[in-house]
């Protein structure tokens, strides 16, 4: 529910959906290149990002927002050996139940 609520905020949606960003040098910080670790943003059509994570208790985790046609999904993977692969399969299955075929960059 928290992710669904957060994705209603356009600023949040823009930030978590940003693939990469360059912050030029300033008096406050050196030059920074920031890259989103949710690489499904560039390989799975309709993915709008959200968050990767890891803790010893929860393992590798991934929360993902995706929209194709009129179907919006939020998937959550916890304690995954391969969170991206698990999410890819979950999104394919979920969109498939609505008759939506998505061609991702994954094999």
Language model features: what each stretch is:
Residues 1-107:
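Domain-terminus/edge residues, biased toward the C-terminal soluble/receptor-binding domains
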């Amino acid at each position: 529910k928290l992710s669904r609520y957060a994705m209603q905020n356009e600023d949040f949606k823009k930030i978590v959906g940003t693939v990469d960003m360059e912050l030029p040098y300033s008096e406050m910080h050196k030059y920074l290149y920031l890259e989103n670790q949710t690489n499904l943003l560039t390989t799975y059509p309709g993915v709008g990002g959200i968050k990767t994570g890891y803790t010893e208790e929860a393992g590798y985790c991934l929360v993902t927002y995706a929209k194709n046609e009129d179907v919006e999904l939020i998937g959550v993977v916890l304690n995954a050996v391969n969170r991206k692969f698990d999410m890819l399969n979950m999104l394919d299955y979920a969109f498939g139940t609505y008759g939506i075929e998505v061609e991702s960059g994954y094999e």
